[in-house]
């Protein structure tokens, strides 16, 4: 009997109060008529329209402007903790400062201060490799030799595969890229791919007590080849 009564409900009456279907919950109870096993597509479409029309305006999906605002607020919330973690590394990606003349750049430490050799060697033990800001603002390792002196070269930390910054792994005594596993020995020579080339070099000269990076254009002492970066 119920199915017979519902079969006389027309699409135009579906959302009408006269038909007794005036809410979303009531509309969901109305089943489409079936003829030879096939549902009435028109009734289904009308039910969807009725459901959408019955939802209060405040409960509907927000318009594009509101969604964009919510996205911005979400990104801002995520950026707060992330930004704090990136502060120590920010100076390595900042534009290089002035100094060192047209052919060289004074090395900067993680706080953006000039690297003074005597002070640096007091706080960095033999065998350490520490990031500084080098030529063109690139992150560049300063190397303290095993005898406690500063190496005459700096090692560019940008991986030659896809440009990730390669950290120094003290336990393994090599540079290991976290992105795709490329490895370089303690002088930056590539020993395992997918990186195709060794890390670039720069001269680490001393001028007025400060470390100055100068472009390396001579033969790469690690490979005996011309420098690919020059």
UniProtKB/Swiss-Prot annotation:
It comes from the Eukaryota. It is a single-pass membrane protein. Its main location: plastid. The keyword Acetylation does not apply. Its EC number is 7.1.1.6. [2Fe-2S] cluster binds at residues 159, 161, 177, 180. Pfam families: Rieske, TM_PetC. The chain crosses the membrane at residues 73-93. It catalyses: 2 oxidized [plastocyanin] + a plastoquinol + 2 H(+)(in) = 2 reduced [plastocyanin] + a plastoquinone + 4 H(+)(out). Keywords: 2Fe-2S, Chloroplast, Disulfide bond, Electron transport, Iron, Iron-sulfur, Membrane, Metal-binding, Plastid, Thylakoid, Transit peptide, Translocase, Transmembrane, Transmembrane helix, Transport. It is found in: Plastid, Chloroplast thylakoid membrane. SUPFAM superfamilies: ISP domain. One of its GO terms (cellular component) is chloroplast thylakoid membrane. One of its GO terms (molecular function) is metal ion binding. Residues 1-25 form a transit peptide. Disulfide bonds join 164-179. Its cofactor is [2Fe-2S] cluster. PROSITE patterns: RIESKE. Binds 1 [2Fe-2S] cluster per subunit. Belongs to the Rieske iron-sulfur protein family. The 4 large subunits of the cytochrome b6-f complex are cytochrome b6, subunit IV (17 kDa polypeptide, petD), cytochrome f and the Rieske protein, while the 4 small subunits are petG, petL, petM and petN. The complex functions as a dimer. HAMAP family: Cytb6_f_Rieske. This protein is 1 of 2 subunits of the cytochrome b6-f complex that are encoded in the nucleus. Component of the cytochrome b6-f complex, which mediates electron transfer between photosystem II (PSII) and photosystem I (PSI), cyclic electron flow around PSI, and state transitions. This is Cytochrome b6-f complex iron-sulfur subunit, chloroplastic.
């Amino acid at each position: 009997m119920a199915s017979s009564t519902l079969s006389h409900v027309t699409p135009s009456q579906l959302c009408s109060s006269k038909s007794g279907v005036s809410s979303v919950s009531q509309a969901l109870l109305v089943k489409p008529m079936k003829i030879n096993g096939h549902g009435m597509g028109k009734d289904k479409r009308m039910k969807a329209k009725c459901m959408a029309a019955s939802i209060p305006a405040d409960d509907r999906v927000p318009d594009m402007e509101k969604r964009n605002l919510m996205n911005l607020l979400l990104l801002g919330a995520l950026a707060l903790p992330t930004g704090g973690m990136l502060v120590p590394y920010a100076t390595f990606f900042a534009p290089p400062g002035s100094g060192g003349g047209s052919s060289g750049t004074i090395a900067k430490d993680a706080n953006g201060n000039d690297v003074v050799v005597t002070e640096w060697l007091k706080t960095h033990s033999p065998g350490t490799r520490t990031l500084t800001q080098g030529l063109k603002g690139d992150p560049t390792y300063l190397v303290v030799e095993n005898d406690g002196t500063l190496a005459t070269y700096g090692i560019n930390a940008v991986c030659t595969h896809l440009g990730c910054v390669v950290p120094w792994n003290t336990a393994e005594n090599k540079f290991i890229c976290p992105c795709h596993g490329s490895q370089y020995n303690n002088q930056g020579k590539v020993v395992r791919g997918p990186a195709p080339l060794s890390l670039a070099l720069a001269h680490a000269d001393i001028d007025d007590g400060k470390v100055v990076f100068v472009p390396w254009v001579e033969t790469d002492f690690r490979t005996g080849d011309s420098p690919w970066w020059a």
